[in-house]
């Protein structure tokens, strides 16, 4: 995905980064069989949910105005979402 440059305030960046970490947590929680979150979903529904979240994370990361944020948890969640097969 190519970088997109946008004009955002530092507060907007902080809010989006936190939302992205929350999205990574959603992916991790849905894919964790020991976690009750998402256990009411079928495997196909789980896949759709994690891929939707991964798309949001990829979009956010592609914005070109990030500073020194650590994207390792986000990258790991995206990789896990893409690897999940029902």
Question: Where are these predicted regions, by residue range?
Answer:
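Beta-rich interaction/scaffold domains
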Residues: 1-86
């Amino acid at each position: 995905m190519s970088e997109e440059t946008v004009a955002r305030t530092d507060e907007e960046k902080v809010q989006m980064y936190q939302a992205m970490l929350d999205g990574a947590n959603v992916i991790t929680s849905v894919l964790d069989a020991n976690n009750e979150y998402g256990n009411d979903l079928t495997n196909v529904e789980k896949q759709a949910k994690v891929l939707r979240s991964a798309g949001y994370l990829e979009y956010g990361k592609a914005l070109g105005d990030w500073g020194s944020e650590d994207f390792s948890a986000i990258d790991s969640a995206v990789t896990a979402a893409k690897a999940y097969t029902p």
